[in-house]
Amino acid sequence: LTIIITILQPMLWLVMYSSVAGSTMQNTGIKNYTAFILPGLIVLVSFGVCSSGGIMNYLMKNDGSFYRILIAPIHRSSIVLGQLLEAVLCSFFEVTIMVIVSLFFSVRIPLNISIILYIIILIFLMSFFMAGICYAISLILPNEVMYETVMNAIVLPIFFLSTALFPANNIHGALAIAIHINPFTHVINILRSFILYERLDIGQMIFVMILFMI
């Protein structure tokens, strides 16, 4: 159920929004708009999965299982790591579904194994980073209502203040600065460069990886 809920919105963006906006965006030089927005939707899917991991903490607290886990003879860091890795694995599962569906909309994923390995590492670090943030926020806030409000206040600006839906070439001023300092803009650009041009910006890749590992 969680997988269906978290992937539903990005899937609607992929299927419906790309079809409607694709013809308009062709005037900007974007030939395959579905391929263009796929990287941003991959980030959105990861955010959704990691956010749902925080919701699970509240559900576990309500039924008492959260506190039973705390008194179990297991190191607490192992418990946290297990929950974070669960979110990462779910992210990979949903990203895989998104990529498979995108193939039916004329998206062609380059079969460059070496670059794909780098992309897998990037998605892993990004998902692990987001899962850690969501987990920490869920431990701080008292209930799921506040948690969902805060997560929406974080996710939506990050998504829209990026290059997820449009190129940032002709954007200037404060909006351009906000887009360029958004770390997920760089993740999206790396994924897009691979999907559209089968290229990998090693410098940008290293920068983002270091940022997520801090």
Locate predicted features:
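Hydrophobic alpha-helical transmembrane segments of integral membrane proteins
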Residues: 6-7, 35-36, 153-154, 159-163, ...
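Hydrophobic alpha-helical transmembrane segments of multi-pass membrane transport proteins
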Residues: 12-16, 33-104, 134, 153, ...
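Membrane-interfacial helix-loop-helix junctions in multi-pass membrane proteins
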Residues: 24-27, 159-213
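Alpha-helical transmembrane segments and their short interhelical loops
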Residues: 76, 80-151, 198-214
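Short helix-capping/hinge motifs at transmembrane helix termini and TM-loop junctions
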Residues: 17-26, 48, 102-110, 114, ...
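Transmembrane helix-loop-helix hairpins at lipid-water interfaces of multipass membrane proteins
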Residues: 7-33
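Aromatic- and glycine-rich beta-strand/loop motifs that create alpha-glucan
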Residues: 1-11, 64
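Short amphipathic alpha-helical coupling elements at transmembrane boundaries
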Residues: 64-71, 142, 152, 176-180, ...
